[in-house]
C-alpha cells in the first residue's frame, strides 16, 4: 500500500488582463511574502512575452524568481514552464542550478515544448512541428540532468549539445530539483510519467469537448490512465498537478456553479462533475 502524496496549492503569478500587476520590486516582494504567509507551497512564474496575439508582457521568470527567493524563506519557486526554444539549454541548466543553490533548494523546474506560434513569430523563432519540439524538450531534459550530475558533460544531441566541462554549481536538491512536465496529449503525458517528478494536466475542460460528449471528469480519468500506464512502478512517487484556470473561492458554491455554467453554456451537473 502506497502512502498518500501531500496535497499542495500553488500560485501562478500572471501579469495580464484582469490580473493584479506588481509594478514595483516592493509590490512583487510583498506578493511573494503574502503567498508564503497564506500557506501556499509554490509561487510559479510563466515564461511568456506576449499572449495570444495581445501585447501582454509577463515578468521574466528567472529574474522574478530570484527576487521571490530573496523575499521568502520556505516558499518554493516554480518556472511554469520554461520553453526550451526560448533558452540556450546549457545556460538554462546553470541558471536553474544557481537559483536552487541560492534559494537553499526551493526550485521546481517546469519544462515545456512551446505552444504559441504567435509568440514564436513575434520573437523571430521558427515554430517547428510538435514532434520536433517535443524531441527537443526530451534532449534538453537529458542535458539538464547531465549538468546536475556533477560529472563532465558529454551531450551531443540533434537539438541540445554541451560537452567538455563539469556543470557547476550543483543544485542543493539531489539528484536535481523536481522536474515538471505537463500536457494534454498522450505522447507528452507519457513522457512526463516516465521522466518527470511532477505531471501536470493542461487545460482540463469545463465542458464536454468532443463528439463523444465526454465530461471533464472522463477526460481527466483518461489522461490519468495514460500516466499510470507509462509510469509503471514510479507512479506512486509522482505529484499530479492540475490547473483550475477558472477558480472561485467562495462560501456560496451554488452561485459559483451558476456563474461558470452561464459563462461556458454548460449544464450545472457537468460543472459539478
Predicted regions and their residues:
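Active-site-adjacent structural elements that line small-molecule/cofactor binding pockets in enzymes
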Residues: 1-273
Amino acid at each position: 500500500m502506497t502512502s498518500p502524496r501531500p496535497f499542495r496549492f500553488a500560485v501562478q503569478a500572471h501579469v495580464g488582463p484582469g490580473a493584479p500587476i506588481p509594478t514595483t520590486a516592493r509590490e512583487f516582494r510583498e506578493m511573494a511574502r503574502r503567498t508564503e504567509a497564506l500557506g501556499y507551497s509554490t509561487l510559479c512564474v510563466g515564461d511568456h512575452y506576449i499572449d495570444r496575439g495581445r501585447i501582454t508582457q509577463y515578468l521574466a521568470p528567472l529574474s522574478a524568481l530570484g527576487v521571490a527567493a530573496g523575499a521568502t524563506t520556505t516558499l518554493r519557486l516554480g518556472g511554469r514552464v520554461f520553453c526550451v526554444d526560448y533558452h540556450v539549454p546549457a545556460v538554462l541548466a546553470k541558471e536553474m542550478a544557481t537559483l536552487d543553490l541560492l534559494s537553499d533548494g526551493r526550485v521546481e523546474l517546469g519544462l515545456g515544448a512551446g505552444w504559441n506560434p504567435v509568440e514564436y513569430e513575434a520573437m523571430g523563432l521558427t515554430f517547428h512541428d510538435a514532434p520536433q519540439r517535443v524531441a527537443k524538450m526530451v534532449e534538453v531534459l537529458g542535458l539538464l540532468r547531465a549538468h546536475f550530475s556533477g560529472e563532465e558533460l558529454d551531450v551531443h544531441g540533434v537539438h541540445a549539445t554541451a560537452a567538455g566541462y563539469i556543470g557547476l554549481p550543483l543544485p542543493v536538491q539531489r539528484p536535481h530539483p523536481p522536474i515538471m512536465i505537463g500536457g494534454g496529449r498522450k505522447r507528452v503525458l507519457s513522457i512526463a510519467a516516465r521522466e518527470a517528478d511532477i505531471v501536470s494536466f493542461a487545460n482540463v475542460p469545463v465542458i464536454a469537448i468532443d463528439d463523444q460528449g465526454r465530461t471533464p471528469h472522463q477526460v481527466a480519468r483518461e489522461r490519468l490512465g495514460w500516466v499510470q500506464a507509462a509510469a509503471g512502478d514510479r507512479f506512486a512517487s509522482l505529484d499530479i498537478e492540475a490547473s483550475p484556470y477558472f477558480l472561485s473561492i467562495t462560501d456560496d458554491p451554488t452561485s459559483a456553479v451558476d456563474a461558470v455554467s452561464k459563462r461556458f453554456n454548460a449544464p450545472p451537473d457537468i460543472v459539478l462533475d
